[in-house]
Swiss-Prot record:
Pathway membership: Phospholipid metabolism; phosphatidylcholine biosynthesis
Cytoplasmic side: 80-89, 193-201, 272-277, 365-372, 440-444, 538-843
Family: Belongs to the class VI-like SAM-binding methyltransferase superfamily. CHO2 family.
Entry membrane topology: Multi-pass membrane protein
Pfam families, per database record: PEMT
Protein name as catalogued: Phosphatidylethanolamine N-methyltransferase 2
Gene: CHO2-2
Coiled-coil ranges per UniProt: none
Length: 843
């Protein structure tokens, strides 16, 4: 059965909606597609009730359909007695093929022309099938069929032709779909093993579970979409109904075409016959073709295609990277079947493909043992997973990988390109080795492996390939290569995608991303080598997602929890909801007891540090009106709130005496590091801080030198601190200063964000450039005898000097070059101007 709203993952609500406030019952209106005639659709019943419920009226065709179903069972019994099971199986195989083609091809053609030209509706109007005065036998039969099918109060002449022809079309659909199902079941029955079924076998248990799940999918889908979408009603008329997300439509894209056919594979698993499995796959493929060529075009025509209207998507970021970096090209990607973005002028692409070919040719030529292949594969996987995970872990923590390239004169994009090569190579090499190992194992075990295992394993591999394809489609190259670890500055809007496969799963790579690996274990009859490999693949994937990807995502996009479609559906199930409620009650009880015990402890130790911390936090959050007028935290005004290095930052502060502590301190932070929490600083100041009172930090002269003024009276405490080159952060960005309490990290006050940037140096004249560099380094105490020195300022080192040159002149000079010329400013100035001239000459 198919549902044409599965593409948009939506469903129409029931035709009757109860209004609680008035107690009235409203019916959903509908209108015809072309003539726009409005009407209230009559009540209809689902296929099973229409055919088999004795309490519901039956039309002539419905009686014929029901009889044909029972006749097929009787015919199967007689055919089996006379011609044997083998011939009976072939007979019903051809019947199933006929009815499946009638479904996907026959119904598909009718719906295609109905969608394009409303052919069925036009045929009904042309032949006056529902006209009272019509005397044709076809019209009389159609009117008789509808009158016997519908309730006694139904008057077909009060309804438009679109609705009446849809009712007749349903009869045609019932016949084909019921025969399709019946002949498939009879074909499977004839294919069951003659020795019987062992219900303790894992295949029986898994297959039965798949069938039961399939039944739930069908039932829940009909609960959500009703007869209107079940029978392709929007090909004939349109309902004025609300679109909702519910049930099975939250679990999977196209649920009636994807997981709605899971029972096919469950039956094939129980049957244990690879021929049944192949026929099931064939039927499933036809259903996807029906979806692609019949339903999807109609959906796009009626409801529009699903497209990302947000220009700040990952795809937009990819385009932006290409636009801003002319030497950047899309990275090489393996789709499992072919290579995308192969660049003949990129050496790393040749290296990747030649490496894979070399591995394959060496394996074919040397014919390594299974043990050797296993050891090589597991080693390659562990090493590649560890290496890439380490890079991303360090990159998330302190931009380690980017810093390596920047300090050597390379760009951020170049760093990202090298990472793309490393990640892609680390992905395809272990995968290639796994394919070789699995192929070798299957070859050696071939006589003892069933075809069904190989086919099911291939299906799992296909699921993983599909999952990877859907992930790439949803998050584009930028997301696939973890661009938010390297190019955070390209992310204009920090919002996780909820499109494509991410509408249903939060981490599809953790759930479906290893399906193919377990498919190899199935194909090799669960040999211990492939089970170990599958465990390694799954474990490394889980560890990476849990301990590297999730923390980084929280840091970049915030801690907001997004509930996936699958999660919503599971929460809606009553048994699971009861379990959730029990855990919530336990958690609430525990939390109440914890709060009560904390209150008791606070009452007995009012002067404790814990009590002080709670008091300060309460003062911060409640913003006590009495104390607020005495709280001041101001920066020296600057045009556009910009500080051009190395000028100092002057900060004036004032606090009520009740809130002040001698151990209070002020820190300088990048706002990107502190944006997640305004009341507590969770990142280190990295030494960019100073105390507010020398008395509080008597032994720390380095961090009290910035104190310029300090005054204290009976009501307030105030002072002035100046962040000069000894405390400034010599990295351009948006910053803020935060006032912290009592040597801790609770924030009492914070400034408005301001910008720190390097000055712009004129590079067309060497003498002017040299003078500007000398002037800058003199102010930061990092010059001696016309040369740059590192020991003059704690935070202005060679790396910072290299960054200054890049930001102020637009020309990169590597750290190695600076060290090579011993920091000589004349040589550096000459080299910068020389590079500028060379670049200009190439334009």
């Amino acid at each position: 059965m198919s549902v044409n709203y599965s593409e948009t993952i939506c469903s129409f609500q029931d035709t009757a909606i109860n209004n609680i406030g008035t107690g009235k019952k409203y019916q959903t209106m509908a209108h015809t597609r072309s003539s726009n005639i409005r009407f209230v659709p009559a009540v209809t019943h689902d296929m099973v009730r229409s055919l088999f419920d004795p309490t519901i009226k039956k039309s002539f065709l419905e009686c014929c359909i029901t009889l044909s179903i029972f006749a097929n069972f009787g015919l199967c019994y007689l055919f089996n007695l006379k011609f044997g099971q083998s011939l009976t199986k072939v007979f019903y195989l051809f019947q199933y093929i006929l009815w499946r083609l009638s479904y996907n091809l026959g119904i598909g053609i009718l719906l295609h022309y109905q969608s394009k030209n409303e052919s069925l509706t036009s045929f009904a109007k042309l032949n006056k099938l529902f006209d009272k005065k019509s005397t044709s036998k076809l019209a009389k039969f159609c009117q008789f069929e509808i009158s016997t099918k519908m309730a006694n109060d139904y008057n077909m002449h009060n309804y438009p032709e679109e609705f009446n022809i849809w009712l007749l079309f349903r009869q045609f659909v019932d016949l084909i779909l019921m025969q399709d199902f019946t002949t498939y079941i009879l074909f499977v029955y004839c294919s069951l093993p003659s020795e019987g079924i062992d219900f303790k076998n894992w295949r029986i248990l898994v297959g039965t579970s798949m069938i039961l799940f399939n039944i739930w999918v069908k039932v829940d889908a009909h609960r959500v979409v009703k007869d209107y979408a079940w029978y392709w009603g929007d090909f004939f008329f349109l309902q004025d109904s609300e679109l909702t997300f519910d049930g099975v439509f939250n679990i999977s894209p196209h649920p009636m075409y994807s997981i709605g056919y899971l029972g096919y594979y469950g039956i094939s698993l129980i049957c244990g016959d690879y021929k049944v499995l192949l026929i099931s796959i064939w039927g499933h493929i036809l259903q996807f073709l029906f979806l692609k060529y019949v339903e999807n075009p109609h959906i796009e025509e009626i409801y529009g295609s699903e497209s990302d209207t947000n220009q700040l998507s990952n795809s937009y970021i990819d385009d932006l990277i290409v636009k801003e970096n002319y030497d950047y090209s899309r990275p090489l990607i393996s789709t499992g079947l072919r290579w995308k973005h192969y660049d003949l002028l990129r050496f790393s692409d040749h290296f990747t493909i030649l490496s894979i070919l070399a591995v394959v040719l060496i394996a074919i030529k040397t014919k390594p043992t299974e043990k050797a292949l296993f050891i090589i594969t597991i080693t390659a996987k562990i090493f590649s997973a560890s290496f890439t995970s380490y890079i991303l872990f360090k990159q998330s923590k302190d931009k380690w990988f980017t810093k390596i390239f920047l300090k050597n004169g390379y760009t951020q994009i170049y760093c990202y390109q090298q990472w793309q090569f490393i990640y892609n190579y680390s992905f395809v090499l272990p995968t290639t080795l796994l394919i070789l190992q699995t192929t070798s194992k299957i070859y050696n075990l071939y006589p003892n492996i069933e075809y069904t295992q190989i086919i099911f394993g291939g299906i799992l591999c296909a699921i993983q390939m599909w999952c990877n394809s859907e992930i790439r489609a949803a998050i584009s190259d930028f997301g696939w290569f973890y661009g938010d670890f390297f190019l955070i500055n390209y992310i204009s809007e920090r919002r996780l995608t909820s499109q494509g496969i991410y509408r249903y799963l939060n981490n599809p790579e953790a759930i479906l991303g290893t399906a193919g690996i377990w498919g190899t274990a199935l194909m090799t009859n669960f040999c211990y080598e492939n089970i170990i490999l599958a465990i390694i693949w799954t474990s490394t994937n889980f560890i990476f997602v849990k301990f590297i990807e999730k923390p980084h995502v929280s840091k970049i996009y915030g801690n907001e929890t997004r509930i996936s479609g699958v999660g919503k559906t599971l929460q809606g199930l009553k048994p699971l909801r009861m379990i959730y409620d029990i855990f919530d009650d336990i958690g609430s009880l525990f939390l109440r007891n914890l709060i009560a015990s904390n209150k008791h402890a606070l009452n007995h130790s009012a002067a404790s540090p814990l009590h002080l911390e709670f008091s300060i936090q309460e003062a911060l959050e409640n913003a006590n009106a009495k104390l607020a007028p005495n709280c001041k935290f101001n920066l020296e005004p600057k045009p556009n709130d910009e500080y051009v290095l190395p000028e100092s930052i002057k900060i004036s502060w004032q606090l009520p005496i009740e809130l002040y502590n001698n151990r209070d301190w002020i820190g300088l932070y990048n706002v990107l590091d502190t944006r997640t929490n305004r009341y507590r600083t969770k990142v280190s100041s990295s030494g960019h801080w100073c105390g507010t009172s020398r008395e509080g930090y008597k032994s720390d002269k380095q961090n009290t030198m910035a104190i310029k003024e300090f005054h204290k009276n009976s009501k307030v405490v105030k002072g002035v601190v100046v962040f000069d080159y000894n405390l400034l952060i010599f990295e351009p960005g948006i910053y803020e200063v935060r006032y912290h309490s009592n040597g801790g990290h609770n924030v009492i006050m914070s400034s408005q964000p301001f910008q720190i940037k390097f000055p712009k140096f004129e590079i067309t004249d060497q003498e002017i450039l040299h003078s500007n560099l000398v002037n800058f380094l003199t102010k930061v105490n990092s010059i001696n005898d016309g040369k740059f020195v590192e020991n003059g300022s704690k935070y202005f080192n060679t790396r910072t000097f290299s960054c200054l040159l890049k930001k102020s002149t637009g020309i990169d000079i590597s750290i190695e070059f600076i060290k090579k010329v011993s920091g000589d400013l004349k040589i550096i100035s000459h080299r910068l101007c020389e590079i500028k001239k060379i670049l200009d000459s190439l334009d």
